[in-house]
């Protein structure tokens, strides 16, 4: 998954860096999303279509998180829960199938990238948005919603955790010896 993201980012920077000023390449703006270079947006699935497909395949707990202010590779992140490995693969297949059907007869077909097809976390990358399909245990473990909500909130929990790391905790004295009293 990270290799796909890394390759997409590097190819975007190489292919679209001439469109932007050099100091705006890494700026997180909606204009520099992965869909910025696509001229015919009608061929790509829209967010309501993806939500309908996820509802049709009975994906549980579908969450849409707007990420255009936080990252440049996607405008939205969609997180859905599948009940089994088969259900996760079915979610991915339904999304890819619908993208193929919508682009039938087009000169250039743009298919989404699918990563982790035989795992408990499948990522389908459409360019404008990224769909994460996880099973219940993986979704609870990775807790992707809190990553994006913590990033969007004003409080930074990483600084608070860093401050707590440097607090020295003295171990409790469990020896039978009484501590020596220092007289002054």
Swiss-Prot record:
Record-annotated membrane-spanning stretches: none
Keyword hit for Transport: no
GO CC annotations, alphabetized: mitochondrion
The entry's keywords: Mitochondrion, Transit peptide
Superkingdom field: Eukaryota
Extent of the transit peptide: 1-39
Stored Gene3D superfamilies: Beta Polymerase, domain 2
Coiled coil ranges: none
Chief location bin: mitochondrion
Keyword Mitochondrion in annotation: yes
Compartments (UniProt record): Mitochondrion
Stored InterPro entries: Iojap/RsfS/C7orf30 (IPR004394), NT_sf (IPR043519)
Function noted in UniProt: May be a ribosome silencing factor involved in organelle biogenesis and required for germination.
Similarity comment: Belongs to the Iojap/RsfS family.
Protein name: Protein Iojap-related, mitochondrial
Species of origin: Arabidopsis thaliana (Mouse-ear cress)
